[in-house]
């Protein structure tokens, strides 16, 4: 397995797909990286030369990926919570942040249902 940005990428897949195993790189970003590194998208990871791998690594060095990106996202969320922004409050309460309805749906964000007991009459 080739190791790029601290991640072992699969050998048998096309390089454009293999790069998406790195957090922060999707298919479009992978295509841009390969274009900048002058490497064909159809090449399998196992067929890459050391020179091509180094060019890909150099192209990725300019992009925030993996740990740096995860840290930035978590710091952004922490900042929203600290300043008391509406989005920060939604994060703190584990509710949807982007304005979705919560009466019936949003189970992914809220977690399993917690049944509320009825008052005795």
UniProtKB/Swiss-Prot annotation:
Belongs to the universal ribosomal protein uS13 family. PANTHER family: 30S RIBOSOMAL PROTEIN S13/40S RIBOSOMAL PROTEIN S18 (PTHR10871), SMALL RIBOSOMAL SUBUNIT PROTEIN US13M (PTHR10871:SF1). HAMAP family: Ribosomal_uS13. One of its GO terms (cellular component) is cytosol. Residues 94-121 are annotated as: Disordered. The gene is rpsM. Keywords: Ribonucleoprotein, Ribosomal protein, RNA-binding, rRNA-binding, tRNA-binding. Disulfide bonds: none annotated. Part of the 30S ribosomal subunit. Forms a loose heterodimer with protein S19. Forms two bridges to the 50S subunit in the 70S ribosome. This is Small ribosomal subunit protein uS13. Located at the top of the head of the 30S subunit, it contacts several helices of the 16S rRNA. In the 70S ribosome it contacts the 23S rRNA (bridge B1a) and protein L5 of the 50S subunit (bridge B1b), connecting the 2 subunits; these bridges are implicated in subunit movement. Contacts the tRNAs in the A and P-sites. Residues 106-121 have a biased composition (Basic residues). InterPro entries: Rbsml_uS13_C, Ribosomal_uS13, Ribosomal_uS13-like_H2TH, Ribosomal_uS13_bac-type, Ribosomal_uS13_CS. One of its GO terms (molecular function) is tRNA binding.
């Amino acid at each position: 397995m080739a190791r790029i940005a601290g991640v072992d990428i699969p050998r048998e897949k096309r390089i454009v797909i293999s790069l998406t195993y790195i957090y922060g790189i999707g298919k479009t970003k992978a295509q841009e990286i390969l274009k900048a590194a002058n490497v064909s998208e159809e090449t399998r990871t196992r067929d890459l030369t050391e020179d091509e791998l180094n060019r890909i690594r150099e192209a990725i060095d300019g992009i925030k990926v993996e740990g740096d990106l995860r840290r930035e996202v978590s710091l952004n969320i922490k900042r929203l919570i600290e300043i008391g922004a509406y989005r920060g409050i939604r994060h703190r309460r584990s509710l949807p942040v982007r304005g979705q309805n919560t009466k019936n749906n949003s189970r992914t964000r809220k977690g399993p249902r917690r049944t509320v007991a009825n008052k005795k009459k």
